[in-house]
Amino acid sequence: MYSAAKAITTTVVHMLVERGEFALDDRVCDYLPTYTGHGKERTTIRHVMTHSAGIPFATGPRPDLRRMNDSDYAREQLGKLKPIHRPGLMHIYHGLTWGPLIREIVSAATGRNIREILATEILDPLGFRWTNYGVAQADVDLVAPSHVTGKPLPAPIAAALKMALGGSMTQIIPFSNSPMFLTSVVPSSSTVSTAHELSRFAEILRRGGELDGVRVLRQETLRAATRECRRLRPDVATGLAPMRWGTGFMLGSRRFGPFGRDATAAFGHTGLTNIAIWADPSRGLAVGLVSSGKPGGHPEAGRYTALLDRINAEVPLG
């Protein structure tokens, strides 16, 4: 699911806030004492959730990816990050750093692994089989591999992508197919799911935080999470694609947005590339859209955005 995982992680974070495990305006360093220096001690969890923590790009030495699941190592590396601006000054999508930060904050605050929390509090009570951060080693061969297709991206977009994600498409995609990544716990990108289960998770959100008798979030919590905190404007980390944000959730819009046109009430998250999970309460719509092709400059890539628009056109506003 790549970054569409962030919709699921955002749900977990707001659930934990609602339960009093931590507050959005708590400082990150109150949970991760190594997250200081270069002004980072002023960073709050809200700054991280809203992509305004000032660390959209991984700075410093390249991390050892073989140690992705090593919390001590992750906290050490996060402590070395140098913000490019003070916390809260601006919003730039944190594609790489968001997941490790959230994982370690949740672990430090609760004493539990975020994968376990997601499973025991949401997925297991609702009978999900395939969804979580990574899969068991025995299930790796069942995961559909991703493929780079089409022409290379235009140079400016390719450069922005490489800066935001730490590599080119031809580097990222093979790594994401590896057993090492597919069994990792990276709340920003390593979630594996199916279209059915993804849309069912979106249905939790569409129904205001409850599904089949399992209450995940109160309606007022979800309303606060989807309240606009960043108006629609281009983001340099997404190739200047216009983005509108709540607290962790991407928000839809009328003309431009991640969920097609005329989707002002929609919220969720997209993933690299042509993957999306969103809920649109105004249409009674919950969507999980998955694909394995990463089309770059392929002439057929426009079919994805056309599909989003078609969904909204076919499902009338309620």
Give residue ranges: language-model regions.
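Short active-site loop at a secondary-structure junction
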Residues: M1-V48, R86-L96, V186
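Short, small/polar residue-rich loop motifs at catalytic or cofactor-binding pockets
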Residues: G271-T273
